[in-house]
Amino acid sequence: KFVAQTGRLPRLSDPIPAHHYAGWALPMIMEGHRILPDVPDRWGYHLRILEPQHLPDEPIPQIHFLSGPHHDTLKHLHQWIRLAANHQSTWTGMTNFIEWLAYALQVSQTPTRLDDAIQVELYQHVNLLEMVQHPYDYFGDIISEGLDNGPWANPNKFYPTPMEICRLMAAMTLPDITKVSLQKIKNLRTAKIADPAGSGTGRMLLLASNISLSLYGCEKDPLVRTVSLINGALYAPWLAFPIPDHILESDLPTDAATSDNATCTQALLAPGHLQA
């Protein structure tokens, strides 16, 4: 509504500052996908599906996730979490930061409880494009390992599967798209792929996003589930903002190609997208 009325994005100096709008950070992420070198334009691809209501002719832009966190990006995340702590525990800082980030990326409609002054500092200092340029599940590591050697809560004892193990599991479970035809690669985009046994922060689903636009998960920990949606907004928008079924169903493969889709679907199907 603000953009429609003013023709521009909200600013920090506006009567209602930019960070008070749900999804204020999404335009930056979309633009990063579009212009940053070596970053696949997955947001552009996602929007080219939603606007005309059908799948484009080109296959899914491929993304390579790092095996571990990028050093400087992780260091900056630690700094932003300490800023969000506002003299409280670092665990509280992390949950505050995740809450703030979820609202900024519109995967949550609940505004953060942080003081406005802290939100302004975060708005001025946080550069989410660092994470976009160095794709990895950073919060999965942070939730399980903490910051440096200080006290850490992790009350639900969340410990993610290492990314390289996830990569191996994905290679064993999912079709190898480097060995099939372009038509089969495009057909697999509508296959339903799920991680139903506790999808965690979404590592398996992020890897599967190179194959499918129909990703499903199940996670009971609300903090961890929120992180998986944040990861989706950063790296695989169809995980955080699912493509409507009528679009995917209108592009279902036919004849011989259907068998490839069905094999993938039957192996990993779960009833629902990212569920609690």
Task: Kindly give the residue locations of the regions a language model identified.
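SAM/dcSAM-binding transferase cores
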Residues: 255-276
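Non-catalytic, mostly N-terminal accessory regions of nucleic-acid modification and defense proteins
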Residues: 1-159, 233, 240
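Conserved S-adenosyl-L-methionine
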Residues: 162-260
